[in-house]
Every structure is written in C-alpha cells, then in structure tokens.
UniProtKB/Swiss-Prot annotation:
<keyword id="KW-0694">RNA-binding</keyword>
<comment type="subunit">
    <text>Part of the 50S ribosomal subunit. Contacts protein L29, and trigger factor when it is bound to the ribosome.</text>
</comment>
<comment type="function">
    <text>One of the early assembly proteins it binds 23S rRNA. One of the proteins that surrounds the polypeptide exit tunnel on the outside of the ribosome. Forms the main docking site for trigger factor binding to the ribosome.</text>
</comment>
<keyword id="KW-0689">Ribosomal protein</keyword>
<dbReference type="InterPro" id="IPR012678">
    <property type="entry name" value="Ribosomal_uL23/eL15/eS24_sf"/>
</dbReference>
<dbReference type="GO" id="GO:0003735">
    <property type="term" value="F:structural constituent of ribosome"/>
</dbReference>
<dbReference type="InterPro" id="IPR013025">
    <property type="entry name" value="Ribosomal_uL23-like"/>
</dbReference>
<keyword id="KW-0687">Ribonucleoprotein</keyword>
<comment type="similarity">
    <text>Belongs to the universal ribosomal protein uL23 family.</text>
</comment>
<dbReference type="InterPro" id="IPR012677">
    <property type="entry name" value="Nucleotide-bd_a/b_plait_sf"/>
</dbReference>
<dbReference type="GO" id="GO:1990904">
    <property type="term" value="C:ribonucleoprotein complex"/>
</dbReference>
<dbReference type="GO" id="GO:0019843">
    <property type="term" value="F:rRNA binding"/>
</dbReference>
<protein>
    <recommendedName>
        <fullName>Large ribosomal subunit protein uL23</fullName>
    </recommendedName>
</protein>
<dbReference type="Pfam" id="PF00276">
    <property type="entry name" value="Ribosomal_L23"/>
</dbReference>
<dbReference type="GO" id="GO:0005840">
    <property type="term" value="C:ribosome"/>
</dbReference>
<dbReference type="GO" id="GO:0006412">
    <property type="term" value="P:translation"/>
</dbReference>
<dbReference type="InterPro" id="IPR001014">
    <property type="entry name" value="Ribosomal_uL23_CS"/>
</dbReference>
C-alpha cells in the first residue's frame, strides 16, 4: 500500500509531545483497514526511520446532540503509536 493510503495525519497533543520527547513514540491517525505491518512500512518509507514497535487503538465516535436536540454520532477512528529505534527522530513542525 502507498503511505498516503495508510497514514491520515499526525496527532499532536500534550500527551503525544511528551511521548515523542521522552520515549521516541509518535502518534498517527490511520485508516481503519490498515494493520501494524502496513503502518510500520508507511512510516519507514515516509520519514526514513527504523520502526521498533507499533501499537494500535480503535476509538468509537462520541455520542453528541445537535442544536435542535437530534442525537448524532462522531466519527470512529484508529490511532497508531509508533516507537522508533533509539537515536531516530521525526521532525514535526
């Protein structure tokens, strides 16, 4: 698979910034149908680094209400936490 068919975006938050600076772990939102091997290959091809481990979490969309009171559901998504080999780093702007 192409890297753009696997990786959607980089998730930046306080927790993900702490993981990247202390443990060398980076957080990505990925497409639902991808597996750990495809995610590792896409990160290695895109950022020219060596992936040590990939952890994946599936999230269900939250229940919400619109202005008119109608119930709706947010989008489901899949998150991947990628651990890099010691010494490797991804420069995120």
């Amino acid at each position: 698979m192409q890297a753009d068919q696997v990786l959607k975006l980089v998730r930046l938050s306080e927790k993900s910034n702490k993981l990247s600076s202390e443990l060398g772990q980076y957080t990505f939102e990925v497409f639902k149908g991808t597996n750990k091997h495809q995610i590792a290959e896409a990160v290695e091809q895109t950022f020219k680094v060596t992936v040590k481990r990939v952890n994946v979490q599936n999230y269900r969309g939250k229940n919400k209400k619109s202005r008119t009171g109608r119930p709706s559901v947010g989008s489901d998504y899949k998150k991947a936490i990628v651990t890099l080999k010691a010494g490797d780093k991804i420069e995120l702007v």
